[in-house]
Curated annotation (Swiss-Prot):
Residues 1-10 have a biased composition (Polar residues). It is found in: Cytoplasm. One of its GO terms (molecular function) is translation initiation factor activity. This is Eukaryotic translation initiation factor 3 subunit B. RNA-binding component of the eukaryotic translation initiation factor 3 (eIF-3) complex, which is involved in protein synthesis of a specialized repertoire of mRNAs and, together with other initiation factors, stimulates binding of mRNA and methionyl-tRNAi to the 40S ribosome. The eIF-3 complex specifically targets and initiates translation of a subset of mRNAs involved in cell proliferation. Belongs to the eIF-3 subunit B family. Its main location: cytoplasm.
Length: 742
């Protein structure tokens, strides 16, 4: 029995109580069920009403469709007649197995019999279950309308007066959402134990926070992070949102088992499937699929090697009108959302296809007026045929550009964020296949005919490549071949490329500079472009983060004056054991983190500015995950954005004043706290002096008597008299300074 959301508490936050091992799910799974005899029957409605003499002819015509789902015969079709010897418009059909009956419902329900009649196919068991006496009221009763309940503002965090960003922090068994406060400690928004069992994930525009459980996923949002939606998918382990947050895809290695009579959005349509595409607004599945990449069964293990899970299994077009999946080596299937029907009723057959990627933005190609979405794919060398890169226009499925490649070992497709370019990274082997090298085939998508520029000056293999967001520059990392048995990986080289200055359009891509003898293996561009962090992650010996500026405002080297870049290393910092680097959505801050999912040494996260200044170090026990909350695209037009940039210096003055005011407030708070502590100390002294004066008066001592001498001359009090001396020490901070050494 698959897990259900019913097993979660109301708040989904409390610890699970310890229980004895429950074998009920195994018993239910392997329980021998008695054959009830009706599982093989289906009922077909929507048939033409015909006289008795035409009934057999109709049955023969109907069998053509019925046989497509399973084995049946004329004798297994019963079409009842009324007292006028006319058919009733429905028939009972028996299949050989219950599985064939289920297949008939899935394949034939809603299909047209002719121009005037559409089949409605249901299992006889379902009709008996739901249409039984007492299940349906004879009189119509209007549904109860729930009172209107105002929903929470799902983008309330964008109205923060200080324009702060939020982030989610997963450590131990707790997940918290916090405001980033620059130099000051983060401000907590919400912090909950057992909020997720695997990981948390923001939607692309930051509206939803997804938590993952054995029962499925849940979406949270609003100022208080209330539960918004539940999507039951037993043992789900992967989640992917569509670009505009209208759909979410879930995947589990275990096929779904839908129980008879079970409640909830899952139906027999999802039985045996691994992938579900959900409509987030309605909370209902659009369609479910079997995973292509599951491991082969025991009988096939020798014939077919085990495959890795390809994720995301479904890839969305930029406008969410289409979603596609690939059957590696055979075809690409493109579906139209939200109906999820196959575009053109057929998959696109592409022999040997290995990978594909949609353009991340809707592209307006030169000379093309009709609407289109573009996807790029590649195929390897097959026999005497060369490897091939193709660009397809959707919905027409027209191949608008191809490029043949030779001596290919592997290909990676990299779209620029605006769809202006697509870089095809081609790893080539020599004819002897003893050495490897990489060259770049850059498609200029918006130009007429989609010309291709080749960058073949690279001598080594490219292990990482990244375009500048909303720009035309890129960074890549190369490395030489690793000697067999080498204990230390070879050094890497970091290369920066930029287009030549050429009037209003971008020229050819040229090398700006190469930094040799590095250990870097990862590239992280600021989401706003210009700044980039080149880091060494998942390493046991190097942990450096290099902060680069591609538009440095200082003097430009003579040899780079014709290029659209001025490269400058701003700072290098180290973070021991770093595994991840994340930019905030505004491009102002960078977080480097070391997750316990990779290693258990010095886990935690550090906050840096875009220029590499470390603002805080946060060692965190059992730290797992840090993710910034994304922001939706700006609502300002290009002209309004241009105006903001023009007046940026004026705005900066206002921001500087606000920062100074915030510091003054913080300093004022410190001074006020010190004054309060001092006043409490003085009040305590005054109270003690008053008590001392009362004691002197009670013992008849003069007020000006020497208290210290009197205390020295006083007789010692024995311990058995029950008296104790209470000593209180109060420390006062006179001054506190903080000095940052650059």
């Amino acid at each position: 029995m698959a897990p259900s959301f019913d097993t979660l508490s109301e708040q989904d936050l409390h610890e699970e109580e310890e229980e004895e091992i429950d074998f009920s799910d195994l018993k239910a799974q392997y329980e021998v069920k008695l054959d009830e005899g009706l599982d093989t029957f289906v009922v077909i409605d929507g048939l033409p009403i015909v006289p008795e003499e035409s009934r057999q002819k109709l049955i023969k015509f109907l069998l053509r469709k019925l046989s497509a789902a399973g084995k049946t015969s004329e004798d297994a079709v019963f079409m009842p007649l009324n007292e006028k010897n006319m058919s009733e418009g429905f028939a009972f059909v028996e299949y050989e197995t219950p599985e064939q009956a289920v297949a008939a419902v899935k394949q034939l329900h809603g299909t047209p019999l002719d121009k005037k009649h559409t089949l409605a196919v249901n299992k006889l068991m379902d009709i008996d279950r739901y249409g039984r006496e007492g299940r349906i009221d004879e009189e119509y009763k209007p549904p109860t309308i729930e009172p209107f309940k105002e929903k929470e503002h799902l983008r309330s965090w964008l109205a923060d007066p200080n324009a702060r960003d939020q982030f989610a922090l997963y450590r131990g068994d707790k997940v918290g959402v916090f405001w980033n406060n620059k130099n000051n400690p983060p401000e907590n928004v919400v912090d909950r134990a057992h909020w997720t069992q695997l990981f948390v994930q923001w939607s692309p525009k930051g509206t939803y926070l997804a938590s993952v459980h054995p029962q499925g996923i849940q979406l949270w949002g609003g100022p208080a992070f209330s539960k918004l939606k539940q999507f039951p998918h037993p043992f789900v382990s992967l989640v992917e949102f569509s670009p505009a947050e209208n759909y979410v895809t879930t995947w589990s290695a275990r096929p779904i088992q839908v129980e008879e009579g079970g409640s909830g959005p899952l139906s027999y349509e999802e039985d045996g499937k691994n992938i579900i595409i959900w409509d987030i607004v309605t909370g209902k599945p659009l369609r479910s699929f079997v995973s292509h990449d599951l491991a082969a069964g025991p009988a096939e293990a020798e014939a077919q090697p085990k495959k890795k899970v390809q994720w995301p299994a479904f890839k969305w077009s930029a406008d969410e009108k289409y979603v596609a999946r690939m059957l590696q080596g055979q075809s690409i299937s493109i579906y139209e959302a939200p109906r999820m029907n196959l575009l053109g009723k057929t998959s696109v057959k592409i022999d040997g296809v290995m990978d594909f990627e949609w353009s991340p933005a809707t592209v307006n190609r030169d000379g093309v007026k009709q609407y289109e979405q573009l996807l790029c794919f590649w195929t390897p060398e097959i026999g005497s045929n060369p490897a091939r890169v193709g660009m397809m226009s959707v919905p027409s499925k027209e191949i608008v550009r191809t490029r043949n490649l030779f001596n290919v070992s592997d290909v990676k497709l990299h779209w620029q964020s605006q769809g202006t370019y697509v870089c095809v990274k081609v790893d080539r082997h020599s004819k002897s296949k003893k050495s490897m090298a990489t060259n770049l085939e850059i498609f200029r998508v918006r130009e007429k005919g989609v010309p291709v520029e080749v960058v073949d000056s690279l001598k080594d293999t490219v292990i990482n490549f990244a375009w500048e967001p909303n720009g035309g520059r890129f960074v890549l990392i190369t490395t030489g071949e690793t000697p067999t048995g080498a204990a230390v990986p070879p050094k890497t080289a970091v290369s920066f490329f930029a287009p030549e200055k050429k009037g209003g359009s971008a020229g050819n891509f040229k090398l700006v500079r190469t930094i040799e003898k590095k250990t870097s293996n990862a590239i992280y561009w600021s989401p706003k472009g210009r700044f980039v962090v080149v880091a060494t992650v998942h390493s046991q010996s190097s942990f450096d983060l290099d902060f680069w500026d591609m538009d440095f405002e200082g003097e430009k080297p003579e040899g780079e004056k014709d290029l659209a870049a001025n490269l400058q290393l701003m700072k290098t910092v180290e973070h021991y054991g770093v595994t991840d680097v994340d930019w905030d959505p505004t491009g102002r801050y960078v977080v480097s983190s070391a997750s316990v999912w990779t290693h258990s040494m010095e886990n935690g996260w550090n906050l840096h500015t875009f220029a590499g200044q470390t603002l805080s170090e946060n060692p965190t026990d059992k730290f797992k995950q840090f993710i910034w909350r994304p922001r939706p695209p700006t609502l300002l037009s290009k002209e309004e954005q241009k105006q903001v940039r023009k007046n940026l210096r004026e705005y900066s003055k206002e921001f500087d004043e606000e920062d100074k005011y915030a510091v003054d407030i913080a300093n004022t708070a410190v001074v006020e706290k010190r004054k309060r502590v001092l006043s409490e100390w003085l009040a305590w002294i005054r109270r003690e002096k008053e008590l001392l004066a009362e004691d002197k008066d009670a013992y008849g001592l003069p007020e000006n008597v020497d208290d210290a001498k009197m205390a020295k001359d006083a007789p010692q009090v024995s311990e058995d008299q029950g008296e104790t001396v209470v000593e209180e020490i109060v420390e006062e901070i006179i001054e506190e300074n903080e000095e940052v050494i650059g």
